Amino acid sequence: ILERGESIACVIATIGTTDAFGIDNLEAIVSLRDRLANEYGLPYRPQVHADAVIGWPWAVFDDYDFPVNPLDFPPRTLRSLADARLAMRGLHLADSIGIDFHKTGYGPIASSLFLCKDHTDLKLISRDPALMPYLFQFGSHRPGVYTLETSRAGAAVLAALANLKLLGKEGYRVLLGHIVTMAEVLRAKLEKAIYA
């Protein structure tokens, strides 16, 4: 693409697939992006977006004490959680991240989040009040500037916020650890049944 003189707007890394929880290596992707941008003398840096809509909660294990294992996860679970944490270590390198609370965040649908490292990137999706005056009729609070959609209720977002506050880091660790433990139990039973 670059050799043809075309631009690359964005590179999307997957942080947790729905089937096998595959995690792309963000450190390698960002390193490759930077190397190619320098090599081709690009006057810009392509955006690196982390599609972490499923994998984001596993970031709660970033500072988990795996050697001590205070939540007493079984060995196979602990190994899986440690592997996921290791694979996600470059999440902070992404220029933007997509998060869904209705997947592994235990929130209702219609509660997603788009985070940008550089706040000026939000201007790329903002609306000009002069072009859309019906969104900006009253007061100085102007949510229509930054939202992609403006006619939805806020209940799902408040429910997601309530989950974050109620569960906290430890609550998500317990829930995710239980998911992984149950997957490991099922895997062990299947392995035993297949190879018995």
Task: Map each language-model feature to its residues.
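Active-site C-terminal subdomain of aminotransferase-like
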Residues: 14-21, 69-196
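Non-catalytic, mobile gating and regulatory segments of ester bond hydrolases
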Residues: 1-15, 28-29, 36-47, 54, ...
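Catalytic PLP-binding core of fold-type I/II PLP enzymes
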Residues: 23-82, 89-92, 123-124
